[in-house]
A protein has these predicted regions:
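An anion/pyrophosphate-binding glycine-rich loop and adjacent beta-alpha core
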Residues: 92-95, 104-229
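A conserved short coil-to-beta-strand element within the FAD-binding core of flavoproteins
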Residues: 35-48
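Conserved N-terminal/central alpha/beta ligand/cofactor-binding core
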Residues: 1-32, 38, 143
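Glycine-rich loop(s) and the adjacent beta-strand/alpha-helix scaffold that form part
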Residues: 63-109
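A glycine-rich dinucleotide-binding beta-alpha-beta segment and adjacent secondary-structure elements
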Residues: 35-37, 213-293
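Short hydrophobic core segments
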Residues: 39, 52, 59-76, 86-87, ...
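Flavin (FAD/FMN) cofactor-binding core of flavoprotein oxidoreductases
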Residues: 14-19, 99-107, 252-269
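A conserved FAD-binding loop/helix module that cradles the flavin
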Residues: 69-89, 292-317
């Protein structure tokens, strides 16, 4: 499968189609002996797992791999059953919660810019309870009908507590390549070129079309005000807005829309070389059922692939 590397060492298929990953996995698995049956419980003999109970009967095996995913996208089958299986073997399960998830925003202007994707902007996540920035990165984000999404927002969401959302503000620097002083100079030059135009018609070289009415509204400058009437103070405030477009987080989107689940089987109870349980012989874990997660960009898939490979090697050890 042809792959490409993007900003931040994120790996994607060249086609940008997730279905190509699925197709590659399906091709690879052809010929394997598979049974399509709903697993309902693990079977034990003392401190050893000996099989799986399913809706179609019991199946016995020397080794059992739990690779059931988390609770994100339950339509794919990841309904959290793996946590139940792990607990039945005596494992500790760290509380599962949504991670890498779009956020709903209080301000209504996001809907006006719906569908707009911004590249090379900087997103900062401010935790007002701690008076500190808990995430800051440059990349891409997307305006949606409910708020914000895209790689930057997904990664930033991993640093927010889902039940205390009112403590977070998102700060978007629309022009991170320019400091405030240079941006003011840029605005001054643009205004000189458009000196007889209305303010709302003077920003086409600086901002995407969908974002212009949003910025005009937030700037406090009347859209039909002539550029030659804009004061130095108004120009400075506009520059400050472009460097710090601030939105208030309302809540996460439903867990069903999360890219990954944070939390899961405590990794201290799993052998990192073989992925075998330290509590139950013959029981192995791989992928998102474990308390391991990472940023978007193929890293979580790599965790799944690598832990599964280690488990497969562990079967024979």
């Amino acid at each position: 499968l042809p792959l490409k590397t993007e900003r931040g060492n994120r790996i994607f298929p060249v086609s940008d189609k997730a279905s190509d990953i699925v197709d590659a996995l399906c091709r690879f698995s052809k010929g394997a002996k598979t049974i399509n049956a709903e697993a309902t419980a693990l079977l034990f003999d003392g401190k050893r797992v000996i099989g799986v109970k399913t809706a179609d009967g019991e199946f016995f095996a020397e080794n059992i791999l739990v690779a059931t995913g988390g609770v994100s996208y339950p339509l794919t089958g990841s309904t959290g059953d793996g946590y139940k299986f792990a607990r039945s073997a005596g494992h500790t399960v760290e509380e599962p919660k949504a991670s890498l998830i779009p956020v709903e925003i209080e301000e209504g202007f996001c809907k006006k810019a719906m569908g707009l994707s911004l590249k090379n902007v900087t997103l900062s996540v401010e935790d007002s309870a701690k008076s500190k920035t808990v995430f800051r990165e440059m990349g891409e984000l997307l305006f949606t009908h409910f708020g914000l999404s895209g790689p930057l927002v997904l990664s930033g969401s991993a640093h927010m507590r889902p039940f205390e959302m009112d403590r977070y503000k998102l700060h978007i620097d629309l022009k991170p390549a320019l400091d405030l002083q240079k941006l003011e100079k840029r605005l001054e030059r643009d205004f000189e070129k458009n000196i007889n135009r209305d303010f709302q018609n003077s920003l086409s070289e600086l901002l995407p079309r969908k974002l212009i009415p949003v910025v005009v509204s937030l700037s406090g400058i009347s859209g039909d005000k002539k550029v030659n009437q804009i004061t130095a103070q108004e120009r400075k405030k506009l520059a400050e807005l472009l460097k710090n477009l601030t939105v208030t987080v309302k809540k996460f989107r439903p867990v069903e829309e999360a890219i990954v689940t944070s939390g899961g089987v405590n990794v201290k109870e799993v052998d990192p070389k073989t992925m075998e349980s330290k509590l139950c012989k013959g029981l192995f874990f791989a992928g998102e059922v474990l308390d391991v997660d990472a940023y978007t960009g193929g890293f979580n898939l790599q965790i799944a692939f690598s832990t599964a490979h280690a488990a497969a090697e562990g079967f024979g050890s």
